[in-house]
Amino acid sequence: LANRANILNLTRNTQFDMKIERPTHSAVAMATLLLLAAAPRLSAAPGRPGPPTRDPHTPGYVTATELPDGTNAPADQDGNFILGPTHLRAPEMTAQPGVPQGKVYDFVLSSSNSTIYPGIARDPGTFGTPDPADPAKLLVPTSHPHPYTRHLAVYVPAQYTPGTPAPFIVGADGPDHGLFTALDNLIAEHKVPAMVAISIGNGSGDAQGSERGLEYDTMSGRYAEFVETEILPLVEQQCHVTLTKDPDARATMGGSSGGSCALIMAWYHNDLYHRVLTYSGTYVNQQWPSNPETPHGAWEFHEHLIPDSPVKPIRLWLEVGDRDNYNPNVMRDNLHDWVVANENMAKVLAAKGYHYQFVFARNAGHTDRAVKQQTLPEALEWLWKDYQPAAK
């Protein structure tokens, strides 16, 4: 037991502040409480009604296959699917007896060690106001430099052979220990490759003017470059793994703005990532500061970028809930409807001939926990279905 993860090793003069192997249940619980405290609230603001419930058969929405209640889309099929209203937890989301468990390393990183993201924050209780000259642009004068810490959790599968290049998946808004459990089971069932999972916490806050918003909603290669230059070298050094350089063996995932971030990484650095998995992806106008090249933020993906660009080697799984976010901020630019945004994504992906699977979930809110517990194993299996390891 002396080697278990309840031993805390404090380190100095490194890129990180803390390293733990196999966090104890109490440590995981504390981290969960901290993350919940920092996470954006999903309830409607006082005086504002909650989002409407959408019918997946609304005229103008994509044609989709209605699945039997409680079942998932087939892991070997592309296209559009409707599931729910019952969401049954997939067995792979629970640790199974006899299944080898990967090793998990936890770190706490400081903004003082980042050259790409030194840190910003918005003053508490403030948000922003629409630009009088452009309702699609938000002015946030209360955003300013501010330090942060972020959590990083790295899962190394029990089946990893030291020295060999490992496939991996990068996740936003980490740590996501449910992902690690799912991988334990899926790897043991030979449904996905033995991959490393790198679950990166955000730099705090939410939406325009925050560190999280800057990282996840900016339409550029900046976040992928942060991961490539500041996170992956640390993972290789401290977790004793070799990470593949093959973009077809690299995936990204996330929910909400973390979902749009996942696609942004693969779109702007398609040389690094080919596989993307998103829940309630924020394919809306959330970018700040505004960029004249992409004035509508991630709404540009389905408005211009995907329709007007050559097809990229991206395989994309995406989900949205029937009660997903609908214009939750002060902007009234008609570019903040999560359901319409994800429906539009499915349309343009189909029109361009992408490999994609779109899930419309009934009885589901924004980044719905029950939906994720039902669908994540199938989504991961679909995401890696065509993966072929590079020839040695």
Regions found by a protein language model. Give the residues of each.
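Bacterial N-terminal signal peptides
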Residues: 29-41
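Bacterial N-terminal signal peptides that target proteins for export
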Residues: 12, 17-30
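Boundary at the C-terminal end of the N-terminal hydrophobic targeting segment
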Residues: 42-46
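Non-catalytic cap/lid and distal C-terminal segments of serine-dependent acyl enzymes
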Residues: 61, 68-392
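Short hydrophobic targeting helices and cationic amphipathic motifs
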Residues: 4, 8-10
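Short acidic, Pro/Gly- and aromatic-enriched capping/linker segments at domain boundaries
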Residues: 49-66, 90
